[in-house]
């Protein structure tokens, strides 16, 4: 089965990001990538399988497995 459209991608939350201060649920990252948020890197801390209630902060790196094109598009928007 062809799964070329699936990608492990990272999304950096910066000072200008419209999702900073929102929870993972509120950010709609899951819906916008047709994927799963599998981890968040916050400084030296790595949080695997974060809760949807986790608040996204500046400099967080969000790791997502999902639709390749949608992850790339979201990176431009965020």
Where are the language model's segments positioned?
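Long, charged amphipathic helices and adjacent flexible linkers at domain junctions
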Residues: 1-11
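Cytosolic Rossmann-like ligand/nucleotide-binding regulatory domains
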Residues: 10, 14-78
